[in-house]
């Protein structure tokens, strides 16, 4: 780790009290039920491509560049009462990510046109906790888009946002495959679990906001499944 990057990490840690206070406040006033499940992972939890986006950016920070276990997380909400199609919902979310994100997180676009989301666009996610970091859009289709982390992010991996029809409603999901970006991040995320809770609060908020942006309401709360896989995967895991 360079001296400059080390100083950045120290500043990030210093900002944690405010982030944790906000997370605690949200938990106290949460009205949408949250259903959490944690379980051991398997080779089935690996993303379809471990190298998603490598050809787009030489500074891609893939899973192999990370530290600690792979965490495969999926946040999902069923939306009732919306007249939108899955593509219409994703278009609204993608056009302005800050409409769906909590106020503690700001998506600052550093490459690409405003108001649209295309492959190759880049953002820096600004947060008062351990989430400041650059990302790039590596996949975009009518009902989904995917970010990959770039060098300097506190995680190494990728995250996908998608919507689909679910009976007479919609289903909005956020799925991530990530490892800590360095040893300090591994400590704060996997050992102390502080960053993990901030992340959970952020993405469950996005799920609830997606329901509102769709003109509907969450049904049954938000489900969060976390599967942890040691890295590199063992032969037993791969068998």
Name every feature range the model reports, one short phrase each.
Residues 184-235:
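A conserved amphipathic terminal alpha-helix motif
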Residues 126-167, 238:
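Hydrophobic-ligand binding "helix-grip"
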Residues 131-133, 138-139, 149, 180-182, ...:
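Beta-strand-enriched cores of mature, soluble protein domains
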Residues 91-99, 152, 165-168, 208, ...:
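Short, intrinsically disordered, mixed-charge
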Residues 2-126, 233-239:
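Hydrophobic ligand-binding cavity/cleft-lining segments
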Residues 60-64, 134-135, 174, 178:
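Short, flexible segments with low predicted structural confidence
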Residues 152-197:
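Beta-strand/loop substructures that line and gate deep hydrophobic ligand-binding cavities in soluble
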């Amino acid at each position: 780790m360079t001296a400059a990057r080390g100083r950045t990490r120290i500043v990030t840690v210093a900002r944690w009290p405010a982030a944790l206070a906000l997370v605690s406040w949200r938990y106290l006033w949460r009205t949408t039920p949250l259903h959490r499940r944690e379980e051991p992972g398997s080779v089935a939890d690996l993303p379809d491509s471990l190298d998603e986006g490598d050809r787009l950016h030489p500074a891609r920070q893939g899973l192999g560049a990370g530290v600690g276990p792979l965490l495969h997380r999926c946040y999902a909400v069923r939306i009732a009462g919306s007249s939108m199609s899955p593509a219409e919902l994703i278009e609204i979310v993608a056009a302005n990510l800050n409409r769906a994100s909590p106020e503690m997180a700001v998506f600052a676009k550093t490459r690409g046109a405003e108001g649209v989301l295309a492959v190759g666009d880049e953002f820096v996610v600004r947060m008062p906790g351990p989430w400041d970091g650059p990302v790039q859009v590596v996949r975009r289709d009518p009902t989904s888009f995917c970010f990959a982390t770039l060098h300097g992010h506190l995680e190494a991996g990728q995250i996908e946002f998608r919507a689909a029809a679910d009976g007479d409603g919609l289903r909005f999901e956020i799925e991530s495959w990530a490892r800590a970006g360095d040893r300090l991040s591994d400590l704060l995320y996997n050992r102390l679990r502080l960053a993990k809770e901030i992340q959970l609060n952020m993405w469950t908020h996005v799920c609830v906001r997606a329901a509102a942006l769709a003109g509907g309401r969450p049904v049954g709360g938000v489900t969060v499944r976390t599967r942890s896989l040691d890295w590199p995967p063992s032969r037993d895991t791969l068998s």
